Amino acid sequence: MTHLRDSGAAAGRRPLALVYRGPASSPGCPEAVAGLLSSGPWNLDVRFTGPDEALPLSAELLSQALLYAQPGGGTLDSAYRRLRRRRRAIRDFVRDGGRYLGFCLGGYLAGATPGFGLLPGDTDQYISSPGATIHEESDTLITVTWRGRPRTVFFQDGPLFVLDEHADATVLATYDNGAPAALVTRFGHGRVAVTGPHPEATTDWYTDHGLPVHHTLDLAMDLVESVMES
């Protein structure tokens, strides 16, 4: 099959971006990611994929896409049980030149224990890490250093990223304990961008939990730009 990510532009089609929506995501998370991808300068054809969507997630569907986004959701073990049959398809998609974009749970799933194994390393729970300043799983705010600047971002039990020694990865943001909070790396011919916090969070995420609103769409755009690079 011809890969849309290789031929779509030449054929005059908008590149296809798939956003998972289903039992391994939480309400509002896929929609926020889809809104981000639709509002950016990338001219993407953004579609939801999942067991109850018009486009079920499959290797054939992924072969037509440029980007696959895994949004926030519930627990890692539960989500992986629902997605493990798609592990090989997702890995092949990225290895062949696709882009993987993971937010919070999507970041955890990019790891290996369990996960899709897309990172030069693994993930761990920030709130249980040494030096963490947040220890609860509830929705809250966290301050990270994003490209050298402190920024306050929506957060809900997101991962930190544990990189292998000499890993080929660009850390975009760090937590206050120095652990990577967002990064971009290569996997085969493709690229992977992941974040523990939620820079894609919309205003209602903050107001629904009584939190001061912080506008972080520029950080989410930076994450997408980083994974879209050649």
Summary of predicted features, one role per range:
Residues R91, G115, P197-S230:
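Extracellular ligand-binding/catalytic regions of CAZymes and related secreted enzymes
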Residues L67-D77, T202, Y206-T207:
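Short, basic, glycine/proline-bearing loop/turn elements
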Residues A24-S25, G74-L76, G107-L109, T123, ...:
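Short, solvent-exposed loop/turn segments at secondary-structure junctions
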Residues L18, L101, G117, L172, ...:
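Hydrophobic/aromatic beta-strand patches that form the interior of the parallel beta-sheet core
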Residues L66-G72, L101-G102, V192-G196:
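Structural motif
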Residues E136-E200, W205:
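Catalytic beta-strand/loop cores that center a nucleophilic Ser/Cys/Thr
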Residues L76, Y80-W146:
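A glycine-rich, often tryptophan-bearing local segment used as a flexible ligand/cofactor-contacting loop or short
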Residues M1-Q64:
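N-terminal beta1-alpha1 cap of cysteine-dependent amidohydrolase-like domains
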